Amino acid sequence: VHLTAAEKSAILDLWGKVNVGEIGAEALGRLLVVYPWTQRFFEKFGDLSSASAIMSNAHVKSHGAKVLASFSEGLKHLQDLKGTFAKLSELHCDKLHVDPENFRLLGNMIVIALAHHHPSEFTPCTQAAFQKVTAGVANALAHKYH
């Protein structure tokens, strides 16, 4: 992902204030509510019958935190996202058979959760930078599909 110095600074400044567990839980929860067909990958998580059930589900919260921890690791390796996410790409492609479009959708949910929790810092320029990063991560996760 090519970022300007200002974009990289905006990302890292905001990321220093992010509660990974909170943002991850909200992003994954929103994905499952807004795009209900994604729930089929999480059937073992128990009750996903309503928005409130999903957003309060301990398994969703835990996995969301895990997902965002991986995303956070990617922020440390912006010049090698494909390498950073190679094993996860292989897992999601070969074993889990996740539609790679879901990575883009989840990236959008991360952006929404960041805007929700950090409204004053989440300027249009910061959003543009995060959109670049989430697109780069989605592309890296989809790499093994190509």
UniProtKB/Swiss-Prot annotation:
The modification N6-acetyllysine is found at residues 82, 144. CDD domains: Hb-beta-like. GO terms for molecular function: haptoglobin binding; heme binding; hemoglobin alpha binding; metal ion binding; organic acid binding; oxygen binding; oxygen carrier activity; peroxidase activity. Keywords: Acetylation, Heme, Iron, Metal-binding, Oxygen transport, S-nitrosylation, Transport. InterPro entries: Globin (IPR000971), Globin-like_sf (IPR009050), Globin/Proto (IPR012292), Hemoglobin_b (IPR002337), Hemoglobin_oxygen_transport (IPR050056). The modification S-nitrosocysteine is found at residue 93. GO terms for biological process: hydrogen peroxide catabolic process. Heme b binds at residues 63, 92. Heterotetramer of two alpha chains and two beta chains. This is Hemoglobin subunit beta. The lineage of its organism: Eukaryota, Metazoa, Chordata, Craniata, Vertebrata.
